[in-house]
Amino acid sequence: MGRRARDRRRQLQPQQRRERSGGGGGGGDDQAGWAGGYPEIVKENELFERYYREQRIVPDGEWDAFMAALREPLPATLRITGYKSHAREILHCLKEKYFRELQHLEVDGQKVEMPQALSWYPEELAWHTNLSRKILRKSPQLERFHQFLVSETECGNISRQEAVSMIPPLLLNVNPDHKILDMCAAPGSKTAQLIEMLHADMNVPFPKGFVIANDVDNKRCYLLVHQAKRLNSPCIMVVNHDASSIPNLQVDVDGRKETLFYDRILCDVPCSGDGTMRKNIDVWKKWTTQNSLQLHGLQLRIATRGVEQLAEGGRMVYSTCSLNPIENEAVIASLLEKSQGALELADVSSELPGLKRMPGITKWKVMLKDGQWFEEWKDVPSNRQTQIRPTMFPIKEEEKLKAMNLERCIRILPHHQNTGGFFVAVLIKKSPMPWNKRQPKVHQKLPGKTEDTEVTATNAGDGSEDATEKPTLAEDEEPKKVQELQNSDTEQSKKGVCGPPPSKKMKLFGFKEDPFVFLPEDDPLFLPIQKFYALDPSFPKMNLLTRTQEGKKRQLYMVSKELRNVLLNNSEKMKVINTGIKVWSRNSDGEQFGCAFRLAQEGIYTLYPFIHARIVNVCIEDVKILLTQENPFLSKFSSETQRKVKDMAMGSIVLKYEPDPEKPDDLQCPIVLCGWQGKTSLRAFVPKNERLHYLRMMGVEVFKAKRKEGESEGKTEEEVQCRPAQTEEGMDVEDKERDAVTKMEAEIDEESPRSPVESSAMEIENKSEDSDQCSKNTNSHINQESKDMNTNNVKD
């Protein structure tokens, strides 16, 4: 398209938009809401109603209520991050400030409905509200509430997540020492829940467990990284594989290679998504039975691969946002049948009291999109047997069916608690799967082994094909295969490098990622850091890594010991997108301040227990100064703070606030900030949204009134009063990159199966301009170190 054509198109677009918004609904300005100007989708689907009436998933007498609920908009739901020490402060702030402001508020003559806590979610940490975006824009109090939600979401203190999607992680019963696999993890709200559970004890910086979050879609993996990074955990790894063929991983156990089996697996598979009709209204016109018939095979393959990698005694949760028994009970029944007693459905009826649920069904039928029904496989004509498979039908033998206990499955119906539709099944693995009885394990000690020279071994279940269709590897082929992989991997492992696969034959799909290079024990880079910050001897320096093999190391990241083990032993198999949290960044002025590396805020809660020097305890008034002023002079701080920093060398410091129990009106949770002491000043290196979070918790008003048309470009009084300081040279770049990820987040719905964006009050209001550009931006957001060697800007 030429320049003139583009100009003409731009001139026409505003007029076309005005014409569209004035027509159709006949409401003109009244219709210019979130979906203003577009023809309203009729929420009717005769085939849908016929199908589910026949399947009898809805109790007698409740059909009208069920359909009425599906036609109502879905309430927006938020979840307060539970493991952070200030979760109670956020809850207190929500209830005592923002909710109280809404108590007697009226908009357009109608009383605003108060947000309600989810009765079944622990400790009142999840809430839902019917406030729409249109209403949020009509009142300053509501606008403040919206800004609070958006900012806290960006910090990771609040997650926007559909209510029913919170159920699977809760039913996993995660402990901090569990090894967890999230098979289809993007966009990452359930993954965030799992990370929270690992860090249940905030006094343990490195829990023994970890989360490996996988997704088949490369772009969605970067959205997953963005979600996970908000929680600042060293125990999360994001990988990019097809879940139905995700490879077996190896770990070093006392010098031997052993297959990694997971204690917990979340198997939230792709689905037709008819449980999301309340938010994804396109489903009304697009729904057919063909969707479930096409997905059934993939869902069964993913679930099968999951139970293969589950440890004996482990728990796997299978879930979909579909109501269809072909995607739900049929998959579970087929999996139980071929497991030959190795799996059983767990009885979770006593878990999550307050959650209204329906039991799984034992009888269902299969329908084609033309409305033709089949009750048994034998009734299916040969020309239809490519669309319909035997595993889609219920088990006919009554004894076998009864032993499966399919009624232990959970189906959530929308009209019971004003939610979306959902299905959950909890599986326990009692013994190895029948087709994995001869699964080989390598217990071969490597010659001349050191901690950094582990190599990768492989076995039958490395995921190249579905294990039920491929026989296990013959035992006499093992030594040869192991030797081949030793030869290819040992050189990089010796250097502590986990990078892209070196051989073309083993190369994985997708983009080339920067390597993960662990610092060797004798690396001269670490000694000045250890001395400057007086690090505890127990500090696990072997877990430090960088993302470049050459040139100056500009960022230092950290992972847990267990994830280090996984990384070093699987560089040939895994496509790792991201892992670790940033703990140190190189100073732009080099070593003139005693140490070349300053502390990074995202890793400070992990590092703090090991730091014994350069810690300054500050009062709450000092914290307010640090967070509201750009580079305040030392004279502005309390005399006690001035005294503490007077004789301290310039450079990076830790600023610690401890609550005073005798002052209950002050903030009652501890705060740890990264700071910088200059010759005459003291500043905080804290991202903007995190600053706003702490200020809100301290009762400082940080609301920014939106400028109306025609207003000057000057700052509002509130913006000037509480303007967060620009903390780093690279902060502008950080904000732009976060905006790019946020735009992608607006494109990809938080909890739907690869579906349109959810219209909730908490969603950040950005539209994506170009998803390919977003992918490029977010890729650089994660893998910047080796690509930006010539800049001193700080990037995440």
UniProtKB/Swiss-Prot annotation:
It is found in: Nucleus, Nucleolus; Cytoplasm; Mitochondrion; Cytoplasm, Cytoskeleton, Spindle. The active site is at C321. Residues 1-11 have a biased composition (Basic residues). It catalyses: cytidine(48) in tRNA + S-adenosyl-L-methionine = 5-methylcytidine(48) in tRNA + S-adenosyl-L-homocysteine + H(+); cytidine(49) in tRNA + S-adenosyl-L-methionine = 5-methylcytidine(49) in tRNA + S-adenosyl-L-homocysteine + H(+); cytidine(50) in tRNA + S-adenosyl-L-methionine = 5-methylcytidine(50) in tRNA + S-adenosyl-L-homocysteine + H(+); cytidine(34) in tRNA precursor + S-adenosyl-L-methionine = 5-methylcytidine(34) in tRNA precursor + S-adenosyl-L-homocysteine + H(+). Gene3D superfamilies: Vaccinia Virus protein VP39. Its EC number is 2.1.1.-, 2.1.1.203. It is an enzyme of class 2 (transferase). One of its GO terms (cellular component) is extracellular exosome. The keyword DNA-binding does not apply. Keywords: Cytoplasm, Cytoskeleton, Methyltransferase, Mitochondrion, Nucleus, Phosphoprotein, RNA-binding, S-adenosyl-L-methionine, Secreted, Transferase, tRNA processing, tRNA-binding. Residues 22-36 have a biased composition (Gly residues). GO terms for biological process: regulation of mRNA export from nucleus; regulation of stem cell differentiation; tRNA methylation; tRNA stabilization. GO terms for molecular function: mRNA (cytidine-5-)-methyltransferase activity; tRNA (cytidine-5-)-methyltransferase activity; tRNA binding. S-adenosyl-L-methionine binds at C184, A185, A186, P187, G188, S189, K190, D215, D242, D268. Belongs to the class I-like SAM-binding methyltransferase superfamily. RsmB/NOP family. TRM4 subfamily. RNA cytosine C(5)-methyltransferase that methylates cytosine to 5-methylcytosine (m5C) in various RNAs, such as tRNAs, mRNAs and some long non-coding RNAs (lncRNAs). Involved in various processes, such as epidermal stem cell differentiation, testis differentiation and maternal to zygotic transition during early development: acts by increasing protein synthesis; cytosine C(5)-methylation promoting tRNA stability and preventing mRNA decay. This is RNA cytosine-C(5)-methyltransferase NSUN2. The lineage of its organism: Eukaryota, Metazoa, Chordata, Craniata, Vertebrata. The gene is NSUN2.
